[in-house]
Amino acid sequence: MKSKSSMPLPPGVTLTRGKHLQGIWVADGFRFSGFDAVVVATPAFKAVERSNEINERAIAIKGIQDALVVALKETGAFASVVIRADEVKAGSRFAVLETTVFEYEKGGGGARYFAGVYGAGQPVIKVRGNLVDSKGAPLFVFEAHRSGESATARMFGGFRSDVEIQAEDIQDLGIDLRDFVKALVSGH
């Protein structure tokens, strides 16, 4: 499947649908080994910027970075997972995970109250991740789309905040990435 986002993919990369990630690509032979560390860079934001979403957007951006750090630490694939390149020990071989939010909506409680079970008013976040080596060559690319995925977001979303629901979605995104990486590392 080609990516449905308007963001171009790196040359030679074609995303395929994963079990829980909407798009995945892994460089031939890459299995998340051979690196001492990974730097999880601050996510870029390339979605529509709405003036009523400033605070929620900032929370989501920080939440994505935090969730990805936790996810990659839990894989055990890297000795060190950091957020800045200057935190990597000198002489270490490291990769960088660059992420971009390419679609974002904070959601709306009123719509969730009346039709949230059908997806109305749910927050939306779509993220592209690109793990690159020190020369910028892509090693792994993923795309994840979340929109009020949990049962509580659907059933009781009208009584919950946009931030709470989106935080669950972001945590779920991290868990799905962790599980994919762990499966790849273990050969499954």
Q: Could you tell me what each predicted segment is?
A:
Residues 59-92, 100-105:
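Extracellular-facing segments of soluble proteins and assemblies that are Gly/Ser/Thr-biased and enriched
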Residues 4, 84-138, 150-160:
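Surface-exposed short loop/turn segments
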Residues 1-66, 156, 182-188:
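A structural "domain/chain start" motif
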Residues 155-188:
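Compositionally biased, intrinsically disordered linkers/stalks adjacent to structured regions
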Residues 17-28, 77-85, 109-116:
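N-terminal post-signal-peptidase region of extra-cytosolic proteins
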Residues 140-142:
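A structural microfeature
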Residues 45, 69-78, 106, 178, ...:
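Sec-exported extracytoplasmic/periplasmic mature domains
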Residues 146-148:
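A short acidic/small-residue loop/turn micro-motif
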